Structures are given as C-alpha cells and as structure tokens.
Amino acid sequence: MQRRQYLSVAGLGVVGLAGCLGLGPDSEPAIEPTGDERVETVADGLNHPWSMTVLPDDFRFVVTERDVGRLSLVDPENGDITPLSGVPEVDAEGQGGLLDVAVHPEFPTEPWLYLTYSAANNDGETTTHIARGRLNRDDESVTDVEVLYRAQPFLDRSNHYGSRVTFGPDERLYMTVGDRQFRDFGPDHVSQDLTNDFGTVLRLEPDGSVPDANPFVDEPDVREAIYCYGLRNAQGLTVHPETDELWVSDHGERDGDELVILEAGANHGWPIAHYGCRYGTDAPVGDRPDEREDVVDPVYYWECGTGGFPPAGMTFYEGTHPDWQGDLFVGNLAGQYLGRFAVDDREVEEIEPLVADEDWRVRDVVSPPETDALFVAVDADAAPILRIEPGQESSTE
C-alpha cells in the first residue's frame, strides 16, 4: 500500500510573498492565507509534469512529462503510473517538449486524447503542434495519432510555445500559441500580426478543421484559425463553469502578468498595451491597456514593481466544498505556490496563496467534480502529484 504523506501548512506567514502577490486593478492588497489546507502526495517520481486531465469514467489522470515526452495514466488512489506508447516525437529544447493534454468532451464514446507539443521540421526549426490519438487502455497505448495543426511559421527558437488547450462550451478546441519570445516591441510585433499564429488563441473543430464562424475567416492573408490575439505566452486556459467564458493566464514581461477573459476577434494588447516593464528597467513596454479603446483590458494584472505572478495552469473550482465554490486557482511558477482567486462576475476580489512553504513550482491544477479536493502537478525532477483539501486538520496514515 502506498504511504500517504500529509503536510500541515497551518501558521504560514506571508513574509517573502508580498511581492509575488501584488495588487489588482482595484489596488486592494492581497489577503493573508488561512493556512489550514491539507496536502497529500498521491503519486511521485514524475519528470517535469506539465499538464494533467481527468478521465471522466475511471478518475485516473492523464499526465504529460515535458522533458522526456512521456504520457502516462496516474491513479491517485494507489499512485500507480502507467506510461502510454504511441506518443508523437517532441523537441524538448528550451521550453519545449510534451505539453498539454485534453480529452474529448464525449469521452469515452469518443476516446480521443488531444496533445500539444513542440516538434521540429527537417531544418531543425520548431513550432507548437496539436495532435490527437485514441486512448487504448487495454494496450496502454495511444493509436491512430494524427497531427491536426502546426502553428505557422516554424522558427529557430525554443521558447514561448504557449500550448494550453481546452474544449470550449461549443465543443471546439481552443489552444494558446506563444509569441516565441520576439522582443521587437511595437505595432509590428508578431502578436499584432495576423499573418502568423504567434501570440494568439486558436479555435479548431475536434478534427482540426477551422470553424466557419471564426472571426477572421473572410479576411485575406489572415490565419483563419485565430480566435483572438495580442497575448505573450499564455500557459493557463479554462472555462468558467457558470458563464461559459474562456479565461487565460498570460505571462508578462517584467511583471505585467494577467488574467484575461477572451473575446472573439479581440486584441488583448501585447505588446502595444501592457502593465509590465521591459526586463531590467522600469520603462513601460507599451501604453496602459485601460487607456486604449482598441484593446481588451485584463480582469486582473500585476503592475511593474509588484513582483508579478508568473502563471501556469488554472481551473475554476467545481468540487463540493462550500468555501471554494466559484473560486479560481492558478499555479504560480516563480512564486512557488497555488494562487486562490475569489471571483465575482468579472471582478477578482482577493488572493490567497496555498502550499506556499514547500518550494513547489505549481505547473497545473485540476478540480474534479464530486470531490472536495484539488489536484496539482509540480514542475520538478522526480515531482509529485498533490491532492489539496480545504479546511481540515493535518494527519498521517
């Protein structure tokens, strides 16, 4: 039997966290953590897990490991890790590798897994890919793998792939693509150029085709898969369970990290409108988003000088505990904690850091229904999958 370790975080202070918590649009300070959550390691030994999703019919997780390009089934009840064969070859240089995973909304009737990853062409240039394959649990494999889309163009760069993917309420695929770390800020930046896929969210049908309803399908020389643009390197993407809005967490330059509600056809600002500064300076990257009418302002942000919140995977809580109902949880990489955001419509009211004393780079978080727990993937060598429960006493078994 697996030994389950429970870590008490009671009494945790906020010393050293204030810069990471920062201020939001209403300039209200972050709240202090309650420090009474219970943390359990349910699986261990993963190599830089980047994403996980829940199989709805047996409550196992599908987990990606970025650097080694491995896809596995993880059982949170006993800690068993089952690698799956048939995964596409990836390029793991820089920030690349095997990245996100999503399941078809009609799973298991439609047994498709959707994978995002970086891969190279014959010239060694890379880009963000999305592929799908059928999960065969009997053979522990992914079969009938087909590439659905390759972000264009391929480049000799290895950073800012974006790569979060989810199904929207319309049962279409939404995928983030990073700006590949182009730093020629201004109106000609790749994130403002719709002839490429960089700095965007793409919308695709489950078979990879472009929906006729996409906002730019009738415009010449524009990439038809683009749903919205003006993002830097969005590594969190989730659907609000009540409003059906798509929320994104986007990395800023120096600070300037954002929580964004996506709008079809919208310009979300990067880099012509941004709350952050250029690296190593106090010089603004662009105009303030709230001073421009041609961009969509984020619903929450960290201004230059606050320390920022380098965000990763995110989810709205859909579990059974009343205290967390409607809250948004976002992984913080550099700050090394899980951020809890209390959301009222489009207003972010408060922040609470969870598991902030363990030096865990929180890469992804999921909230399965019919349980009070969150599950978190930590980005590290020999990394754990964690179960986090609210408001309970610590224990060991």
Where are these regions (language model features)?
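Beta-propeller domain segments
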Residues: 76, 96-98, 106-108, 120, ...
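Sec-dependent signal peptide cleavage junction
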Residues: 17-30
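Acidic, Gly/Ser/Thr-rich repeat motifs that build Ca2+-stabilized beta-propeller blades
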Residues: 29-176, 245-252, 307-344, 369-391
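N-terminal secretory signal peptides and thylakoid transit peptides that target proteins
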Residues: 1-18
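A generic structural motif
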Residues: 13, 87-90, 180, 217, ...
